[in-house]
A protein has these predicted regions:
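Dynamic "connector" segments at or just before major functional cores
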Residues: 1-202, 209-222
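An anionic, glycine-rich sequence signature occurring as long contiguous blocks
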Residues: 2-19, 23, 251-354
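Generic recognition of stable, solvent-exposed alpha-helical segments in well-folded globular domains
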Residues: 32-35, 68, 83, 87, ...
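Flexible loop/turn segments at secondary-structure boundaries
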Residues: 97-98, 160-162, 202, 235-240, ...
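Short, well-ordered coil/turn segments that N-cap beta-strands
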Residues: 149-151, 224-228, 250
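Acidic/histidine-rich, metal-coordinating catalytic segments
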Residues: 156, 227-237
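Short, surface-exposed basic-aromatic patches at helix termini and helix-loop junctions that form
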Residues: 242-251
Length: 355
């Protein structure tokens, strides 16, 4: 029986030979998707960008695997679902991975081993890690076909559990586990700006400010006239960051943790909103929660000035819930700022709908 062959012309050729997909019992792989990722990586030139930031201490005449190939192999393994470096000892002979690194699938030499990957992963020092972060920021800036007029940068962190005794691991009481708490920065289009691996502790205001300064200053070097807005939850509403934003012309809109002082400012509004919702329930079960806003100037002992605070009071079947945000934006009403500007951040964790 003749074997059907599907030619994928969009895949990059290997050694001037076109890549085809066919039924073949010999030399099979379950990871053909890495060829698609390889095309993306080549277009971004990501492995070469990062390799250029590293100093290779190996003797040139004894190098079998180039730095960019090692990094490329490691990245492709991660996106294919093999985050453990130990998997490289098996994947190094996988035909799909060989083709992704421009090697013949059968006769080509094996890729690098796990010890080589581990040595390269521990090669970078602080200055080289900083250069790699700058390379990622350059990659982000290069992704724009035209100079942007406005950028909104979303700051957030995620808990990354560990399954061993990795360096810098730390116990986090909130998540009740060991791991890391990396900070991620995305823009509103979903582009990754930067991710920073760090220990599993709540970042301090000084740490956040240092990161924000480096990111913003790098973007402004490329786009001097761009308007930048920072957005994040209450972890990032620290006085150091807000004061720096105000001094350098940055916009910000952050979540704000509640306290007794803020609660006193909205106590009357909470009572009225809860009573109105209860009255509606008595007449007819409402289809939506009832939401009201209060816009006022407030402050904290650690702040050097008062700032605009918006309280969102929402009454529903579970009672009255109040959230706060703080911002230096002055050109919008409270409802629009909260619903259209703040709640758009973190698509996976903020799905609040206007009442």
């Amino acid at each position: 029986m003749e074997k059907d062959t599907l030619v994928l012309p969009s895949l990059s050729p290997v050694g001037d030979k076109p890549i085809s997909v066919m039924i073949d019992d010999r030399c099979t792989s379950a990871d053909g998707g890495v060829l698609l990722f390889q095309d993306v990586e080549r277009r971004l030139n990501l492995a070469n960008r990062l390799a250029a930031c590293l100093h290779d201490p190996r003797q040139p005449g004894k190098i079998t695997h180039a730095l960019d190939d090692i990094l490329r192999f490691r990245m492709l393994a991660i996106v294919a679902g093999y985050p453990d470096g130990n998997d490289c000892d098996v994947l190094r002979d996988d035909p799909a991975f060989k083709m992704a690194l421009d090697r013949p699938p059968v006769s080509g030499p094996a890729l690098c081993s796990q010890p080589t990957v581990s040595r390269i992963e521990n090669l970078a020092r602080r200055t080289e890690l900083y250069r790699m972060a700058e390379a990622m920021l350059d990659l982000y800036c290069d992704s724009f076909p035209v100079v942007p007029h406005h950028l909104t940068l979303d700051l957030d962190e995620s808990f990354d559990r560990v399954h061993g005794e990795q360096e810098l691991r730390k116990f986090n009481a909130y998540y009740d586990d060991w791991g890391f708490l990396p900070i991620h920065i995305f823009d509103t289009s979903g582009r990754l700006v930067l991710s920073v691996l760090r220990e599993a502790a709540t970042p301090s205001g000084r740490e956040i400010l240092t990161l924000v300064k480096r990111v913003v200053n790098h973007i402004r070097e490329r786009f001097p006239r761009v308007r930048i807005r920072l957005r994040g939850d209450s972890h990032y509403a620290c006085p150091e960051v807000m004061s720096w934003c105000e001094a350098t012309g940055l916009e910000y809109i952050f979540g704000l943790s509640g306290n007794a002082t803020l609660a006193a400012r909205v106590q009357a509004l909470e009572a009225r909103t809860g009573a109105r919702y209860a009255a509606r329930c008595a007449a007819e079960p409402p289809k939506f929660k009832l939401r009201r806003y209060k816009d006022f100037q407030g402050g904290a002992k650690s702040w050097n000035c008062t700032r605009r605070i918006i309280a969102r009071v929402e009454a529903g079947p579970d009672g009255v819930d109040t959230r706060y945000i703080v911002t230096n934006l002055t050109d919008r009403r409270a409802q629009g700022l909260y619903e259209r500007k703040y709640c758009q951040r973190g698509r996976m964790e903020n799905r609040e709908c206007p009442a």
